[in-house]
């Protein structure tokens, strides 16, 4: 039996590669996935999955003291022809199929939501306009649940836009039929006092393609947990993300790609910029290649650009492999300040120092913004980046 190896990933804040038949991402979790909140003890901050999160800023989402109010959030779905939009109760059989909660807040959300939004794209339907889901906080506490399901060979783009002020815990499910193609853009543009904790579960069918773009700007605390599993061979997943963490903000993205099926691919790329005292970004990237997942091809990357003193980044990529019969697997993580050579080059071409710094940050994010593919959303995010830069560069 292979002995586990811990190999530091160059230039990472933290990270390792573990190669072992008995060492999996699941073994590091304090409890297995469950829909029952009672299966998860109240966290105290010493647990591996909670050690980076300031529990006192969760407003009671983690210990059962956050009680839902009737005016927590308002959800509005705009969908083109050919899409079915339903509001369903807790007992609907279509809920919970993409995966179970993996922590207490997600389980609390699952046990506390009253109604769920279910968006269904019919088999072989190809949408020419995006589905837009607006989640607007109205100042209260809310628990939410959404399901987006594509039939076989359907194609769709979904934009989920979070705005306003709320204390929200929510689960989102993406279910892709065989050969389906789904792009999801999830934007967290909350007011500065908002708290948002979410788990996103994607179940990718045979030969299906899933692309997720997570964008996080606002909020006092945002903690997101995107997860991907495969329902058949040939599936592909791309997980992209960008975040801009300001003074005293806590933004945490914890990813898991579970390669549980042969001949699937995944590509993870997240980038963040930080500025101001107390700005804290956390990125955890877990990729598990199970013994049955021969022919896997995977890569994950996290890059962080620190714009001012007083900001902190914790970046932890983890790659765990249970079979040697793979196409490729790797990871990278780096955190740094402005590239002096880039700045010198731009200034030598007559570009003022302030504008040179702006160009570097724009270029840093450009490749991920372009992954969105929706001009109006891309323009809005570029405007947000410019507004953030006004405060620092």
Regions found by a protein language model. Name each.
Residues 6, 96-351, 361, 365, ...:
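Conserved beta-strand/loop scaffold segments within soluble protein domains that form the structured core
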Residues 28-31, 39-41, 299-300, 340, ...:
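Generic hydrophobic-segment detector
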Residues 2-115, 126-127, 131, 270, ...:
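N-terminal amphipathic, basic helical "cap/leader" segment at the start of enzyme domains
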Residues 50, 359-360:
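Residue-level "edge-of-site" marker
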């Amino acid at each position: 039996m292979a002995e586990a190896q811990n190999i530091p990933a160059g230039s990472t804040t933290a990270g390792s590669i573990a190669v072992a038949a008995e060492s999996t991402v699941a073994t590091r979790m304090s409890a297995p996935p469950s829909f029952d909140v009672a299966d998860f003890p109240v966290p105290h901050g010493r647990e591996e999955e909670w050690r980076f999160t300031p529990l006192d800023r969760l407003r009671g989402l983690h210990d059962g003291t956050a009680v839902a109010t009737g005016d927590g959030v308002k959800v509005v779905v705009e969908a083109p022809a050919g899409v079915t939009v339903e509001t369903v109760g807790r007992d609907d059989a279509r809920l919970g199929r993409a995966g179970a909660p993996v922590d207490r807040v997600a389980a609390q959300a699952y046990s506390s939501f009253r109604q769920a939004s279910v968006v269904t794209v019919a088999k072989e339907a190809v949408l020419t306009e995006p589905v837009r889901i607006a989640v607007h906080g109205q100042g209260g506490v809310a628990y939410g649940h959404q399901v987006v399901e594509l039939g076989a060979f359907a194609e769709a783009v979904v934009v989920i836009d979070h705005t306003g002020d709320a204390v929200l815990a929510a689960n989102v499910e993406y279910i892709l039929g065989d050969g389906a193609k789904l792009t999801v853009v999830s934007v967290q543009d909350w007011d500065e006092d908002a708290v948002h904790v979410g788990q996103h579960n994607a179940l990718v069918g045979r030969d299906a393609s899933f692309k997720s773009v997570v964008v996080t700007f606002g909020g006092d605390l945002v903690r997101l947990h995107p997860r991907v599993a495969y329902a058949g061979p040939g599936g592909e997943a791309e997980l992209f993300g960008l975040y801009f963490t300001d003074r005293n903000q806590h933004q945490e993205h914890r990813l898991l790609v579970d390669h549980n099926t042969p001949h699937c691919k995944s590509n993870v790329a997240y980038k963040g910029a930080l500025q101001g005292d107390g700005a804290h970004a956390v990125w955890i990237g877990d990729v598990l290649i199970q013994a049955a997942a021969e022919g896997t091809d995977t890569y994950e990357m996290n890059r962080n650009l620190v714009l001012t003193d007083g900001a902190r980044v914790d970046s932890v990529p983890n790659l765990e492999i249970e079979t040697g019969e793979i196409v490729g697997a790797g990871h990278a993580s780096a955190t740094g300040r402005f590239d002096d050579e880039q700045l010198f080059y731009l200034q030598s071409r007559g570009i003022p120092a302030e504008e040179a710094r702006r160009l570097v940050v724009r270029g840093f994010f450009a490749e991920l913004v372009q992954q969105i593919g929706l001009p109006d959303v891309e323009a809005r995010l570029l405007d947000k980046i410019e507004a953030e830069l006004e405060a620092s560069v």
